[in-house]
A protein has these predicted regions:
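A short, N-terminal "cap"/entry segment at the start of jelly-roll beta-barrel domains
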Residues: 1-58, 143, 154-157, 161-175
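Conserved hydrophobic/aromatic beta-strand scaffold that supports enzyme active sites
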Residues: 48-50, 61-63, 82, 104-106, ...
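Small beta-barrel nucleic-acid-binding modules, principally OB-folds
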Residues: 58-67, 72-74
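Glycine- and acidic-residue-biased ligand/ion/polar-headgroup-sensing regions
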Residues: 67-69, 76-94, 100
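Short intrinsically disordered coil segments
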Residues: 79-80, 141-151
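Short acidic-glycine-tyrosine-enriched beta hairpin
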Residues: 90-114
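A short hydrophobic beta-strand segment most commonly corresponding to one strand
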Residues: 105-106, 121-139
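Asparagine-centered strand-capping/turn motif at beta-strand->loop junctions
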Residues: 117-118
Length: 175
């Protein structure tokens, strides 16, 4: 809806209270952390850094970091996924496009693909928002495993406890 009046005091902060049950915002000053312990290992040379683990709406946002070339995984998304490539590049075997540094990718619901990091890429970091579940599948669609926001939270708790940050370190990212 277009503005009906002119805001004559645009630099005055909002003066009313926020809704009583509104969740706190998440502010992460350094999304790509210096502390290696913040990265949660997912496989050899593959880790993620949680940004928002939204258990009430069933999605997660994270940085995916891959420090190897080759096939990462084949998976299906029943819901939409958004990605922003921060470092390096990658592609899917099923498509002829390449996701490059600075590029944005929308993955439509129902998409199944095989993520590959090229041989000449030392490090790839992509920010992903994954909605719902990610199903790991074989080439013929048979489900071999899954991830959702709850498995992500569990992985974080176990890792952060192990590296000395404490299992509750993940709580700052959970909404």
């Amino acid at each position: 809806m277009p503005l009906e009046d002119t805001d004559t005091d645009a630099r005055t902060p909002y003066q009313l209270p926020f809704p009583q049950d509104a969740l706190q915002e998440i502010v992460i000053p350094k999304a790509i952390p210096d502390d290696e312990r913040v990265w949660v290992p997912q496989a050899e040379n593959v880790a993620f850094r949680p940004l928002c683990l939204n258990r009430s709406q069933g999605y997660w946002m994270n940085l995916l970091r891959v420090r190897k070339s080759g096939v990462l995984s084949r998976h299906r998304h029943p819901q939409a996924v958004h990605g922003l490539v921060l470092r390096g590049r990658w592609h899917y075997l099923e498509h002829d496009w390449v996701a490059e540094e600075g590029g944005y990718v929308f993955e439509a619901p129902g998409e199944t693909h095989t993520l590959v990091v090229p041989d000449d890429v030392d490090e790839m970091i992509t920010m992903f928002q994954v909605n719902g579940v990610m199903l790991y599948v074989d080439p013929y669609g048979k489900t071999m495993g899954y991830e959702d926001v709850f498995t992500k939270i569990d992985m974080c708790r176990a890792h952060y406890e192990k590296v000395g940050l404490g299992a509750d370190y993940v709580d700052q990212f959970v909404r």
